[in-house]
Amino acid sequence: MKKILFTFVALLATLSLSAAEPKTGLQNVELKNLKNEPAMLPWYGEKHILVFYVDPDRHKQNEDFAREIEENHAAQGENIEGFGVLNLKDSMLPNGLIRTIARKRTEKNGAIVLADTDRKLAEAWGLGDCNNQFVLMLISREGEMLFMSKGEITEEQKAEFYRVVTKYR
């Protein structure tokens, strides 16, 4: 019994350590634009990208921080661009309604927003369960995940985000 328990604890420790390592080799993913046409992630491989992966049911989660990032231009620079991806698979709202609302907003602010109708991005990048989550990711042009926050962002995560993003702008 002790051997089984020890093996289980060792396995958990190994999984915890590997989860803490940055993900590398992330690939571009084909999603949909707001007109439901195929679209690849913009600037992938050309610039570092800041991805706001949002469940529309929780679009206000981290709203203040997202606005702060926009106002202080943290996602803008010679080497970095940001855009949004709507996690439509996990939303209870009709996809057409969400796209219409998003199109109207992007016409006003010029933002780029894509739609993930089948969790393609979450699965391809190993994000796990993103239902009811606001996921913020910084991906290098080489395909390495430099920063990720899921759910309500903490003050410590905000500080870490600014520390990391400053190096890549």
Pin down the residues of each PLM region:
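Short active-site neighborhood of thiol/selenol oxidoreductases, capturing the structured segment around
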Residues: 42-65
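Structural microenvironment flanking redox-active thiols in thiol-disulfide oxidoreductases
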Residues: 59-106
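Thiol-/selenol-based redox modules, centered on thioredoxin-like
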Residues: 132-169
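Cleaved targeting-peptide boundary
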Residues: 20-26
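Hydrophobic h-region of N-terminal signal peptides that target proteins for export
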Residues: 9-18
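Positively charged n-region of N-terminal signal peptides that target proteins for export
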Residues: 1-4
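A short beta-strand-turn-helix
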Residues: 29-48
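Short, internal strand/loop/helix patches
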Residues: 83, 100-132
